[in-house]
């Protein structure tokens, strides 16, 4: 197949990061997969996204109107101009295949593939398929899933794992973080708290309240990535020796430091924690579309790699209970770490590209 392949990775970091991971593979092995070029297609607002600051290929920036309010009524009219630009541009770039990573911003690329009979492939990161996947599954040649779909969703595809960027992948795939936690070798357990790029006030406040427990503070050391908008607020309320960080472009050192991760349950964070063999305490974002974070967390918990706290408040009771239960039982963390690592797929990016372009149905 000659021509180019385009990866529509526009919306949030959960769509962008795995898309860039696929681009890394394609950029390195273009001829092996039958293409002359690879492009990323992303929203202009994502120009400062860390994953797109040093991309493995050219990024085509675009704008597409968002749904919501009165714009929903006039959406077809608002969509026409950017879509016409997409058509002319993609024809010039000789786009032969489109990989949609999900989210409304992938709509122009997907429609182009359908209308002009190009090959369409979809990646679904969550246990609950998003609207893009549900609507356009029947038009796609193949679909790659990061996790098994939740009960009630029947879409043909292959579960491979969420593609992870090379710069995040640990150099040595093992669970060294939790091998030395038994008495006499390590007195404290490192807990990494991830609120995401925009932060999560609920998680920050829950951790600060948890640290007020003397048994917790004597056994566990906390590092909070608060999100830039919540850094000052969290820092001012911190009374213990927690390490407060606004945001980290390079997550590898933080994962290597951690023994446990407390986080939301977006697919990207889950995939990264899995490749580091980290036990997880997951607090799903309750307002995520189709409650997909809840289903993601339920899957991780059902496999034994983490536990879930379903809460919309910052009440620390359940978190304190979990941490106290683990305090003198390092074997629990080691076992969860083994399960976490077993669920990971560090080669998901390559396997996804191979599934799309070399494997036969």
Task: Tell what function each PLM region has.
Residues 332-346:
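A short, well-ordered alpha-helix in the C-terminal region of glycosyltransferases
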Residues 303, 308-310, 314-331:
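C-terminal "capping" alpha-helix adjacent to the active site of nucleotide-linked donor transferases
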Residues 27, 39-41, 45-55, 170-176, ...:
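Donor-nucleotide binding loops and adjacent catalytic segments primarily
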Residues 345-361:
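C-terminal alpha-helical cap of glycosyltransferases
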Residues 36, 114-175:
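Active-site-proximal region of nucleotide-activated glycan assembly enzymes
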Residues 5-10, 33-77, 310-312:
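Conserved nucleotide-sugar phosphate-binding/catalytic loop shared by glycosyltransferases and other
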Residues 95-97, 256-270, 278-279:
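Acidic donor-binding loop of glycosyltransferase active sites
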Residues 68-97, 115:
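An amphipathic, basic-hydrophobic alpha-helix
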């Amino acid at each position: 197949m000659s021509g180019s392949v385009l990866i529509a990775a526009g919306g949030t970091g959960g769509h962008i990061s795995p898309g860039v991971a696929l681009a890394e593979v394609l950029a390195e092995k273009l001829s092996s997969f039958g293409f002359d070029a690879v492009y990323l297609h992303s929203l202009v607002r994502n120009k400062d996204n860390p994953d797109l600051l040093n991309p493995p290929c050219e990024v085509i920036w675009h704008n597409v109107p968002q749904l919501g309010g009165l714009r929903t009524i006039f959406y077809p009219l608002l969509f026409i101009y950017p879509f016409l630009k997409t058509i002319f541009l993609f024809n010039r770039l000789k786009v032969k295949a489109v990989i949609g990573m999900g989210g409304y911003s992938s709509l122009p690329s997907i429609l182009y593939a359908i209308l002009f009979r190009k090959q369409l492939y979809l990646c679904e990161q969550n246990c609950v398929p998003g609207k893009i996947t549900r609507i356009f599954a029947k038009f796609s040649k193949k679909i790659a899933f990061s996790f098994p779909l939740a009960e009630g969703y029947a879409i043909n595809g292959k579960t491979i794992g969420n593609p992870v960027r090379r710069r995040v992948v640990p150099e040595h795939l093992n669970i060294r973080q939790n091998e030395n936690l038994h008495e006499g070798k390590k007195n404290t357990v490192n807990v990494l708290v991830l609120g995401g790029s925009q932060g999560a006030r609920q998680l920050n406040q829950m951790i600060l309240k948890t640290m007020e427990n003397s048994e917790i503070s004597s056994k566990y050391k906390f590092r909070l990535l608060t999100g830039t908008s919540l850094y000052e607020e969290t820092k001012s309320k911190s009374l213990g020796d927690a390490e407060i960080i606004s945001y980290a472009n390079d997550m590898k050192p933080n994962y290597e430091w951690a023994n446990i991760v407390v986080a939301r349950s977006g697919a990207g964070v889950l995939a990264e924690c899995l490749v580091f063999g980290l036990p997880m305490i997951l607090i799903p974002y309750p307002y995520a579309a189709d409650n997909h974070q809840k289903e993601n967390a339920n899957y991780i918990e059902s496999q034994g790699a983490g536990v879930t706290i379903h809460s919309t408040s910052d009440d620390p009771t359940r978190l304190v209970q979990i941490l106290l239960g683990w305090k003198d039982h390092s074997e629990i963390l080691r076992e969860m770490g083994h399960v976490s690592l077993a669920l990971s797929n560090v080669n998901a990016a390559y396997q996804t590209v191979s599934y799309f372009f070399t494997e036969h149905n």
